[in-house]
């Protein structure tokens, strides 16, 4: 295609021909089986695409790079034979001669700070009784909503939550906690049950960018409205953010505990912008997923520096796929 300016890309992406030739309705991301994993990446403007394999989600060298094969609608894919559970990967996508290493926009788990994607057997992340978990039916008289940040829910030592679980998903699973351990004033899950709330609305729990998961002792705080990976949980809310499967399992444990207490779960989502413009989506298909002005500059209706181009077919598909994934898997 040759080097294109943002304005030229905008014209391309909004053309009927581009939509007709590149809109893809099939599955994307990793498809795990014990026999092997297929990776599929939508990158229609790429000249080349490759997968980089790692043993760990951080601080390890690449153990191999393999080319992806281009297919219809600009979907690149590769089959990795053997049980790939627990292996980490990134993609290198070359557009206009510029190679960018990036995570998988459809990854189901990731390493420290979400910089590397992880292949995960989701069946291994299911807590005990997960297959029987169902959201409770909340009668009309109890349909009140209590909004909370996962961190704020239990971070204070006065919460009575065990230290390793404070500010984490697992704090929602601990029962019998009282203020300063006084045995009188309930906290956390016991407090919610006494309030009689019907639903807990969790402020963003998918992977966000402003908290460094590698520095848990550093005083850091954000509500989470700065997403970096839409399809797996935030690592700072897990007890071991370096192991990608832990955040998935512990998020499910939190949801199961709330359901067991008769409380429904509402997930606050942020699809209108991302933390940085250089992100897994923009590194894969530059300028496609974010709205531009006529001169190619970024539109900023979100007030956060970029705004999601939900009118474009594959951006809309991405949002819907992500929402369905959370609703069905969690």
Please give the residue ranges for each predicted region.
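Short proline/glycine-enriched turn/loop motifs at strand-loop junctions of beta-rich domains
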Residues: 42-49, 83
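Conserved aromatic beta-strand anchor motif in extracellular beta-sandwich/beta-rich domains
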Residues: 51-55
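The feature marks proteins involved in alpha-glucan
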Residues: 1-34, 70-177
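Structural beta-strand segments of beta-rich domains
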Residues: 35-40
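Surface-exposed loop/edge segments in extracytoplasmic proteins
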Residues: 58-66, 100
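Substrate-binding/active-site clefts of carbohydrate-active enzymes
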Residues: 151-330
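Short S/T/G- and acidic-enriched coil/turn segments that sit immediately N-terminal to beta-strands
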Residues: 64, 74-77, 185
């Amino acid at each position: 295609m040759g080097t294109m300016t943002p304005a030229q890309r905008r014209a391309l992406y909004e053309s009927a021909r581009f939509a007709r030739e590149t809109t893809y309705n099939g599955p994307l991301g990793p498809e795990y089986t014990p026999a092997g994993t297929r990776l599929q990446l939508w990158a229609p403007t790429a000249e080349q695409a490759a997968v980089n394999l790692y043993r760990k989600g951080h601080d390890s060298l690449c153990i191999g790079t393999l080319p992806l094969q281009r297919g219809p609608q600009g979907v690149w894919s590769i089959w990795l034979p053997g049980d790939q559970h627990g292996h980490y990967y990134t993609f290198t996508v070359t557009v206009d001669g510029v190679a960018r290493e990036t995570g998988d926009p459809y990854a189901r788990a990731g390493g420290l700070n979400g910089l590397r994607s992880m292949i995960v057997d989701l069946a291994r992340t299911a807590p005990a009784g997960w297959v029987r978990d169902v959201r409770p039916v909340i009668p009309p008289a109890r349909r009140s909503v209590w909004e909370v940040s996962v961190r704020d829910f239990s971070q204070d030592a006065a919460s009575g939550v065990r230290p390793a679980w404070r500010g984490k998903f697992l704090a929602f699973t601990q029962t019998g906690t009282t203020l300063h351990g006084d045995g009188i004033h309930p906290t956390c899950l016991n407090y919610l049950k006494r309030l009689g709330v019907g639903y807990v609305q969790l402020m963003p729990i998918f992977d966000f960018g402003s908290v460094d998961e590698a520095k848990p002792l550093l005083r850091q705080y954000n509500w989470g409205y700065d997403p970096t990976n839409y399809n797996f949980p935030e690592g700072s809310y897990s007890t071991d953010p370096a192991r990608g499967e832990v955040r998935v399992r512990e998020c499910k444990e939190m949801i199961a505990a709330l359901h067991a207490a008769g409380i429904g779960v509402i997930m606050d989502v942020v699809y209108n912008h991302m933390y940085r413009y250089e992100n897994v989506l923009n590194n894969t298909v530059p300028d496609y997923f974010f709205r531009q002005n006529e001169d190619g500059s970024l539109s900023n209706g979100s007030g956060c520096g970029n705004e999601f181009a939900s009118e474009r077919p594959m951006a809309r598909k991405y949002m819907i796929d992500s929402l369905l994934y959370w609703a069905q898997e969690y």
